[in-house]
């Protein structure tokens, strides 16, 4: 191993190496130029030959051109190194910085996904805790319910009791309605069965409508009206429809006092002549 002198700096060594490389590149360029001139001479000599040979020579020249382009690239690189000795270090630093950034970008999604997983786990744990607390609180009310005495008697069914209660309520409502007022519809339903008509009913006329009454009703004052006219007479009163006035004598008429009558002719016995 050859020792380098102490006075020589590393920058000087780098410059010397670069110069040696440049000299080798220049020699290669000169050799390539000589080869190009030779190929040109060969092309001129072989112009009258077959086209295949021409194609082959052109292909070789294309390869030489690529080598020339490579040499130009090497020259540009060496010149850049001579101008800026610390460029290699800078490029290496830039490459390392880019690599670090890429690694950071790749690590960030992994970290975010990990955070999302932890958040979902925490939410699920909180939900389970709430459910457990609710289930723990619900049994506290059960002893009070168990301690309450049963309202139903032993040996009876709850459904039967509810049915009986509703039936009693319906009966009470019906009785109250009957006591408070008797509607016209109920009265008409009671008198649907029309009595048999006799000759006198056909001859009698209602003093209001002047028609023979299908159902004759008599008031306390002794006047007879047909059923529709009597109800209209009572309902047209101005005293809250509690009672009406007779159309003939203006006496008070209550529906509860009205009577259903059957009109008949007086039967007169005929004397038999002897």
Swiss-Prot record:
The gene is SLX8. PANTHER family: ELFLESS, ISOFORM B (PTHR47094), RING-TYPE E3 UBIQUITIN TRANSFERASE (PTHR47094:SF1). InterPro entries: SLX8 (IPR049627), Znf_C3HC4_RING-type (IPR018957), Znf_RING (IPR001841), Znf_RING/FYVE/PHD (IPR013083), Znf_RING_CS (IPR017907). The keyword RNA-binding does not apply. Its main location: nucleus. Component of the heterodimeric SUMO-targeted ubiquitin ligase (STUbL) complex composed of SLX5 and SLX8. The modification Phosphoserine is found at residues 50, 67. Residues 1-117, 136-159 are annotated as: Disordered. GO terms for molecular function: ubiquitin protein ligase activity; ubiquitin-protein transferase activity; zinc ion binding. GO terms for cellular component: cytoplasm; kinetochore; nucleus; SUMO-targeted ubiquitin ligase complex. Disruption phenotype: Leads to the persistence of YEN1 foci. This is E3 ubiquitin-protein ligase complex SLX5-SLX8 subunit SLX8. Component of the SUMO-targeted ubiquitin ligase (STUbL) complex SLX5/SLX8 that mediates ubiquitination and subsequent desumoylation of sumoylated proteins and proteins containing SUMO-like domains for their degradation. The STUbL complex SLX5/SLX8 stimulates ubiquitin conjugating enzymes, including UBC1, UBC4, UBC5 and UBC13-MMS2, and mediates the proteolytic down-regulation of sumoylated proteins. The STUbL complex SLX5/SLX8 is involved in ubiquitin-mediated degradation of histone variant CSE4, preventing mislocalization to euchromatin. Its EC number is 2.3.2.27. SMART domains: RING.
């Amino acid at each position: 191993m050859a020792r380098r002198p102490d006075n020589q700096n590393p920058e000087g060594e780098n410059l010397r190496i670069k110069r040696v490389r440049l000299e080798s590149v220049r020699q290669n360029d000169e050799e390539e130029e000589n080869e190009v001139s030779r190929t040109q001479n060969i092309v001129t000599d072989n112009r009258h030959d077959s086209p295949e040979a021409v194609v082959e020579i052109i292909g070789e020249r294309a390869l030489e051109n690529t080598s020339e382009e490579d040499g130009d690239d090497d020259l540009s690189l060496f010149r850049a190194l001579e101008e800026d000795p610390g460029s290699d270090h800078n490029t290496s630093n830039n490459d390392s910085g880019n690599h670090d950034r890429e690694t950071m970008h790749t690590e960030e999604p992994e970290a975010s996904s990990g955070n999302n997983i932890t958040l979902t786990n925490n939410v699920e744990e909180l939900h389970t805790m709430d459910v457990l607390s609710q289930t723990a609180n619900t049994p506290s009310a059960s002893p009070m319910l168990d301690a309450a005495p049963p309202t139903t008697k032993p040996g009876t069914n709850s459904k039967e009791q509810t049915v009986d209660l509703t039936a009693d309520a319906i009966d009470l409502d019906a009785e109250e309605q009957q006591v408070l007022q008797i509607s016209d519809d109920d009265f008409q339903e009671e008198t649907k069965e029309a009595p048999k008509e006799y000759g006198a009913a056909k001859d009698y006329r209602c003093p209001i409508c002047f028609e023979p009454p299908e159902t004759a009703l008599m008031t306390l004052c002794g006047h007879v009206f047909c059923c529709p006219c009597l109800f209209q007479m009572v309902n047209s009163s101005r005293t809250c429809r509690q009672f009406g006035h007779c159309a003939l004598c203006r006496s008070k008429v209550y529906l509860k006092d009205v009577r259903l009558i059957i009109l008949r002719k007086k039967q007169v016995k005929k004397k038999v002549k002897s």
